Amino acid sequence: MSRSHSVRDSDAIKALEDRRYRAMLAGDTAVLDELCSDNLIYTHSKADHDDKASYLRKVGTRYFTYLEITHPADRILVVGGAALVTGRMTAKVLVEGTIVHVDNRYLAVWVREHGAWKFVAYQPTPIINS
């Protein structure tokens, strides 16, 4: 892959990550459905995990409601048909009526499926005593 393709792909992934987080804040399951791979593995900071259907159901039913999110990416690495995004995500989330403050380092994985980038995995690691 040429450097210009890599830069274009990195820019595309950055835009998709921004769109994904906006959809999370808005509770927009239509956009999340479009962005997520059918093979999604979404791990949460307390180690529970969802597949695509259960994640969209939780967002759609407001099981958790994202109130605030910051998500600066430290690095976007495009390797073949995959893109790895690392960074720090902080959030204020309403989970079953309780406000939860989240502060994680994360790895988000995007893959090319049928010519389009799809969000396939998320793995956070809580930052202790931040």
Predicted regions and their residues:
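A beta-strand edge to alpha-helix "cap/lid" segment located at domain peripheries
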Residues: S2-L35, N39-S130
